[in-house]
Amino acid sequence: MPKPRNIAAVKQLTALFQESNAAVLTEYRGLSVAQLTQLRTALGPDTTYAVLKNTLTTIAAKEAGVTAFEGQLSGPSAIAFITGDPVEAAKGLRDFAKTNPQLIVKSGMLEGRAISAADVTALADLESREVLLSKVAGVLKATQSKAAALFQAPLSKTVRTVEALREKQAAGAPAEAAPVEAPAAETVDA
Protein backbone atom coordinates (compact mmCIF):
# COMPACT_ATOMS: atom_id res chain seq x y z
CA MET A 1 0.00 0.00 0.00
CA PRO A 2 1.48 3.39 -1.00
CA LYS A 3 2.43 5.81 1.72
CA PRO A 4 0.37 9.01 1.95
CA ARG A 5 3.44 11.21 1.38
CA ASN A 6 4.25 9.29 -1.83
CA ILE A 7 0.66 9.73 -3.03
CA ALA A 8 0.93 13.47 -2.35
CA ALA A 9 4.30 13.63 -4.13
CA VAL A 10 2.87 11.88 -7.21
CA LYS A 11 -0.09 14.32 -7.26
CA GLN A 12 2.29 17.27 -7.03
CA LEU A 13 4.55 15.93 -9.79
CA THR A 14 1.54 15.16 -12.00
CA ALA A 15 0.36 18.76 -11.55
CA LEU A 16 3.84 20.06 -12.43
CA PHE A 17 3.90 17.96 -15.62
CA GLN A 18 0.43 19.20 -16.61
CA GLU A 19 1.13 22.89 -15.90
CA SER A 20 4.51 22.98 -17.65
CA ASN A 21 4.91 23.79 -21.32
CA ALA A 22 8.45 22.38 -21.19
CA ALA A 23 10.63 20.27 -18.92
CA VAL A 24 14.30 19.31 -18.90
CA LEU A 25 15.59 16.12 -17.30
CA THR A 26 19.03 16.47 -15.73
CA GLU A 27 21.50 14.47 -13.71
CA TYR A 28 22.88 16.43 -10.80
CA ARG A 29 25.44 13.96 -9.40
CA GLY A 30 28.24 15.81 -7.59
CA LEU A 31 26.44 19.14 -7.13
CA SER A 32 26.18 20.59 -3.64
CA VAL A 33 23.03 22.01 -2.08
CA ALA A 34 24.50 25.50 -2.52
CA GLN A 35 25.06 24.85 -6.24
CA LEU A 36 21.50 23.54 -6.66
CA THR A 37 20.20 26.67 -4.93
CA GLN A 38 22.31 28.78 -7.29
CA LEU A 39 20.84 26.86 -10.26
CA ARG A 40 17.28 27.41 -9.04
CA THR A 41 17.99 31.13 -8.77
CA ALA A 42 19.53 31.21 -12.26
CA LEU A 43 16.47 29.51 -13.78
CA GLY A 44 14.14 32.25 -12.55
CA PRO A 45 10.63 32.33 -11.13
CA ASP A 46 8.94 30.57 -14.07
CA THR A 47 10.94 27.37 -13.59
CA THR A 48 10.69 24.84 -10.79
CA TYR A 49 13.81 22.69 -10.43
CA ALA A 50 12.92 19.56 -8.46
CA VAL A 51 15.13 16.69 -7.29
CA LEU A 52 13.00 13.59 -7.77
CA LYS A 53 12.56 9.96 -6.89
CA ASN A 54 12.63 8.09 -10.19
CA THR A 55 9.80 5.66 -9.36
CA LEU A 56 7.43 8.42 -8.25
CA THR A 57 8.35 10.52 -11.29
CA THR A 58 7.63 7.58 -13.62
CA ILE A 59 4.18 7.14 -12.05
CA ALA A 60 3.42 10.88 -12.22
CA ALA A 61 4.56 11.11 -15.85
CA LYS A 62 2.26 8.23 -16.81
CA GLU A 63 -0.67 9.85 -14.98
CA ALA A 64 0.03 13.14 -16.79
CA GLY A 65 0.37 11.39 -20.17
CA VAL A 66 4.04 12.37 -20.55
CA THR A 67 6.18 9.82 -22.39
CA ALA A 68 9.23 12.00 -23.01
CA PHE A 69 11.28 10.60 -20.13
CA GLU A 70 10.47 6.90 -20.42
CA GLY A 71 13.53 4.77 -19.76
CA GLN A 72 15.70 7.77 -18.85
CA LEU A 73 14.93 8.06 -15.16
CA SER A 74 17.95 6.44 -13.56
CA GLY A 75 20.54 7.72 -11.15
CA PRO A 76 20.22 11.07 -9.38
CA SER A 77 17.58 12.85 -11.47
CA ALA A 78 16.07 16.30 -11.34
CA ILE A 79 13.64 18.01 -13.68
CA ALA A 80 13.32 21.69 -14.50
CA PHE A 81 9.57 22.25 -14.95
CA ILE A 82 9.17 25.35 -17.13
CA THR A 83 5.96 27.38 -17.20
CA GLY A 84 7.48 30.51 -18.78
CA ASP A 85 9.79 30.99 -21.74
CA PRO A 86 11.62 27.68 -22.39
CA VAL A 87 14.45 29.53 -24.16
CA GLU A 88 15.36 31.49 -21.03
CA ALA A 89 15.33 28.33 -18.88
CA ALA A 90 17.45 26.44 -21.43
CA LYS A 91 19.95 29.33 -21.42
CA GLY A 92 20.05 29.20 -17.62
CA LEU A 93 20.77 25.46 -17.68
CA ARG A 94 23.42 25.85 -20.40
CA ASP A 95 25.20 28.68 -18.62
CA PHE A 96 25.14 26.84 -15.29
CA ALA A 97 26.46 23.65 -16.91
CA LYS A 98 29.39 25.62 -18.39
CA THR A 99 30.62 26.54 -14.92
CA ASN A 100 29.43 23.30 -13.27
CA PRO A 101 30.12 20.38 -15.63
CA GLN A 102 28.62 17.92 -13.12
CA LEU A 103 25.16 19.01 -14.32
CA ILE A 104 24.24 16.81 -17.28
CA VAL A 105 21.20 17.49 -19.45
CA LYS A 106 19.71 14.12 -20.41
CA SER A 107 16.66 15.11 -22.46
CA GLY A 108 13.65 17.35 -22.48
CA MET A 109 10.04 17.85 -23.35
CA LEU A 110 8.70 20.83 -25.28
CA GLU A 111 4.95 21.27 -25.66
CA GLY A 112 4.38 17.54 -25.09
CA ARG A 113 7.06 16.33 -27.53
CA ALA A 114 10.26 14.63 -26.47
CA ILE A 115 13.47 16.47 -27.36
CA SER A 116 17.08 15.39 -27.04
CA ALA A 117 19.84 17.01 -25.00
CA ALA A 118 21.17 18.49 -28.26
CA ASP A 119 17.73 20.03 -28.89
CA VAL A 120 17.80 21.61 -25.43
CA THR A 121 21.20 23.13 -26.28
CA ALA A 122 19.85 24.37 -29.63
CA LEU A 123 16.88 25.87 -27.80
CA ALA A 124 19.31 27.75 -25.55
CA ASP A 125 20.99 29.23 -28.63
CA LEU A 126 17.73 30.83 -29.80
CA GLU A 127 16.83 34.36 -28.89
CA SER A 128 14.07 34.87 -26.36
CA ARG A 129 10.44 35.03 -27.41
CA GLU A 130 10.29 38.79 -26.78
CA VAL A 131 13.33 39.46 -28.97
CA LEU A 132 11.96 37.31 -31.80
CA LEU A 133 8.55 39.02 -31.60
CA SER A 134 10.16 42.46 -31.68
CA LYS A 135 12.16 41.46 -34.77
CA VAL A 136 8.99 40.26 -36.50
CA ALA A 137 7.26 43.52 -35.56
CA GLY A 138 10.20 45.50 -36.96
CA VAL A 139 10.07 43.61 -40.25
CA LEU A 140 6.32 44.16 -40.51
CA LYS A 141 6.69 47.88 -39.78
CA ALA A 142 9.46 48.25 -42.36
CA THR A 143 7.33 46.46 -44.95
CA GLN A 144 4.40 48.77 -44.23
CA SER A 145 6.63 51.85 -44.47
CA LYS A 146 7.97 50.71 -47.83
CA ALA A 147 4.45 50.07 -49.10
CA ALA A 148 3.29 53.50 -47.94
CA ALA A 149 6.24 55.16 -49.70
CA LEU A 150 5.50 53.18 -52.85
CA PHE A 151 1.86 54.26 -52.90
CA GLN A 152 2.75 57.86 -52.06
CA ALA A 153 5.41 58.25 -54.79
CA PRO A 154 3.06 58.91 -57.77
CA LEU A 155 1.08 61.43 -55.72
CA SER A 156 4.18 63.33 -54.60
CA LYS A 157 5.53 63.33 -58.18
CA THR A 158 2.26 64.88 -59.38
CA VAL A 159 2.38 67.51 -56.63
CA ARG A 160 5.99 68.43 -57.52
CA THR A 161 5.03 68.77 -61.22
CA VAL A 162 2.09 71.06 -60.38
CA GLU A 163 4.33 73.16 -58.08
CA ALA A 164 6.93 73.50 -60.86
CA LEU A 165 4.25 74.70 -63.29
CA ARG A 166 2.97 77.20 -60.73
CA GLU A 167 6.47 78.57 -60.14
CA LYS A 168 7.04 78.84 -63.87
CA GLN A 169 3.78 80.77 -64.33
CA ALA A 170 4.56 83.01 -61.38
CA ALA A 171 7.93 83.84 -62.93
CA GLY A 172 6.13 85.15 -65.98
CA ALA A 173 7.04 82.44 -68.40
CA PRO A 174 4.14 81.05 -70.32
CA ALA A 175 3.34 77.49 -69.52
CA GLU A 176 3.95 75.16 -72.37
CA ALA A 177 0.66 74.32 -73.91
CA ALA A 178 -0.09 70.89 -75.12
CA PRO A 179 -0.08 70.63 -78.90
CA VAL A 180 -3.51 71.24 -80.35
CA GLU A 181 -4.73 68.62 -82.70
CA ALA A 182 -6.38 69.77 -85.88
CA PRO A 183 -9.95 68.64 -86.31
CA ALA A 184 -10.34 65.72 -88.61
CA ALA A 185 -11.60 66.56 -92.07
CA GLU A 186 -15.12 65.56 -92.83
CA THR A 187 -15.72 63.45 -95.82
CA VAL A 188 -18.90 63.65 -97.73
CA ASP A 189 -20.10 60.68 -99.64
CA ALA A 190 -21.80 61.57 -102.78
Curated annotation (Swiss-Prot):
Gene3D superfamilies found in the cross-reference section: 3.30.70.1730, 6.10.250.290
Keywords, in A-Z order: Ribonucleoprotein, Ribosomal protein, RNA-binding, rRNA-binding
Pfam families to which the protein is assigned, alphabetical: Ribosomal_L10 (PF00466)
Superkingdom per UniProt: Bacteria
Matches recorded under CDD domains: Ribosomal_L10 (cd05797)
InterPro entries referenced in this protein's UniProt entry, alphabetically: Ribosomal_uL10, Ribosomal_uL10-like_sf, Ribosomal_uL10_bac, Ribosomal_uL10_bac_type, Ribosomal_uL10_CS_bac
Gene Ontology CC: large ribosomal subunit
Transmembrane intervals: none
SUPFAM superfamilies found in the cross-reference section: Ribosomal protein L10-like
Region of interest (Disordered), ranges: 170-190
Subunit composition and interactions: Part of the ribosomal stalk of the 50S ribosomal subunit. The N-terminus interacts with L11 and the large rRNA to form the base of the stalk. The C-terminus forms an elongated spine to which L12 dimers bind in a sequential fashion forming a multimeric L10(L12)X complex.
Functional note: Forms part of the ribosomal stalk, playing a central role in the interaction of the ribosome with GTP-bound translation factors.
NCBIfam families: PRK00099.1-1
Family: Belongs to the universal ribosomal protein uL10 family.
Protein name: Large ribosomal subunit protein uL10
Organism: Kineococcus radiotolerans (strain ATCC BAA-149 / DSM 14245 / SRS30216)
